[in-house]
């Protein structure tokens, strides 16, 4: 689902209006914006009038997260291993992964430095992010994980920490038997540069 806001038109707007119990004219106007902000307020999301990936997850969890036949046993957290303060987009990661011979970005969700959550590879498709654990897992990555000298460091912004927790909580709600892990539990790496088990012990 793409990000939409006031002025947007099309099928995604109709879906949003349907979920919000509005007339479905496919035009994102003031009434849709107001209803969306009411929904976001009730779900502790920023009242910014933007229906982004994080909002879609809250609006349509079944549509976004369970419309596939894969059994999910693990949710694995990664970092992009990029320097603190540097942005890194889904398209940049996709380009890097394709250059390595993969057919798409390896991760399913990417959390940017501003806290926005972006879809990578479709959850319906097996990822390519953790050897031996891809078939029944979801790969979540945050941008960062290294200091400016490329040494491992937890560089997560407050917004990233909040969004990671939010996303993992939603994923756990839909895959209650899935366990949350850091990449470093399965490989001799520092990734994701923080203790996942300790941080998400309550999930």
Each language-model region and where it sits:
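Surface-exposed patches in mature extracellular/periplasmic domains of secreted proteins
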Residues: 47, 101-108, 175-184
């Amino acid at each position: 689902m793409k990000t939409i806001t006031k002025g947007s038109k099309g099928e995604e707007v109709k879906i949003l209006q349907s979920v919000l119990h509005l007339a479905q004219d496919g035009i994102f106007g003031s009434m849709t914006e107001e209803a969306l902000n009411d929904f976001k307020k009730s779900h502790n999301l920023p009242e910014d009038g933007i229906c982004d990936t994080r909002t879609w997850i809250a609006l349509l969890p079944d549509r976004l997260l369970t419309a596939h036949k894969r059994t999910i046993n693990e949710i694995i957290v990664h970092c992009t291993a990029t320097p603190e303060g540097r942005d890194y987009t889904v398209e940049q990661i996709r380009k890097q992964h394709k250059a390595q011979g993969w057919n798409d970005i390896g991760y399913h969700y990417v959390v940017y430095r501003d806290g926005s959550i972006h879809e990578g590879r479709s959850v319906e498709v097996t990822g390519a992010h953790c050897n031996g654990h891809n078939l029944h897992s979801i790969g979540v990555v945050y941008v960062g994980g290294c200091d400016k000298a490329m040494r491992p460091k937890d560089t997560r912004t407050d917004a990233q920490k909040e969004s990671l927790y939010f996303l993992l909580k939603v994923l756990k709600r839909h895959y209650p038997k899935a366990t949350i892990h850091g990449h470093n539990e399965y490989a001799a790496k520092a990734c994701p540069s923080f203790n996942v088990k300790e941080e998400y012990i309550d999930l």
